[in-house]
Amino acid sequence: MSDVENQPFFNIQRIYLKDLSLEQPNSPAIFLEQEMPAVEVEVDVKAERLAENVYEIVVAGTVTAKVREKVAFLVEAKQAGIFDIRNIPAEQIDPLCGIACPTILFPYLRSNIADSITRAGFPPIHLAEINFQALYEQRLAEISQQQQQGGAPNGTTLN
């Protein structure tokens, strides 16, 4: 093989909105509320090997806004990407899929969530940046702790 064929290769094949759901269980009455909603945000990352050197990474986000325990809206979205990753050492694949790829996908997720909230008639909510390296390290610590306790880790790992 030539040196070019052995060079590390990282390519985004496709970025797409895999799933989007918006619920407004208390509309239209919730629009009459004057109080600002309390907003909860959850983010998760999943990775799946589709083929040799091809991975699907999904960043899932859930935004729930409540006014006095009444749900104003609930948005669930999954932003996905298909990445071609070749000639990368095996021990670097998992961090690449857990840190670099989600960092690429998150701005798309944030935009889609903000757009759907605005289109639903609510003031925009802009999600803060996420440190995916810290999130990845936290997940590794949780997996290590679960393994020490004899439990199976949650989520998807790449092998």
From Swiss-Prot:
Instruction: Please give the superkingdom of this protein's source.
Output: Bacteria
Which Cys pairs are S-S linked? none
Q: Which InterPro entries match?
A: SecB, SecB-like_sf
Q: Name one GO biological process term.
A: protein folding
Cellular component aspect of the GO annotation? cytoplasm
Alphabetically sorted, this entry's keywords are: Chaperone, Cytoplasm, Protein transport, Translocation, Transport
> Keyword Transport on this protein?
yes
- The UniProt entry lists the main location of this chain as cytoplasm
Q: Where in the cell is it found?
A: Cytoplasm
List, in alphabetical order, the Gene Ontology terms for molecular function in this entry. unfolded protein binding
Q: What HAMAP family does the annotation carry?
A: SecB
What is the annotated quaternary arrangement, including any partners?
Answer: Homotetramer, a dimer of dimers. One homotetramer interacts with 1 SecA dimer.
- What family classification does the UniProt entry report for this protein? Belongs to the SecB family.
Summary of the function given for this chain in its UniProt record: One of the proteins required for the normal export of preproteins out of the cell cytoplasm. It is a molecular chaperone that binds to a subset of precursor proteins, maintaining them in a translocation-competent state. It also specifically binds to its receptor SecA.
Q: What is this protein called?
A: Protein-export protein SecB
The species this protein was found in = Burkholderia mallei (strain ATCC 23344)
Q: What is the lineage of its organism?
A: Bacteria, Pseudomonadati, Pseudomonadota, Betaproteobacteria, Burkholderiales
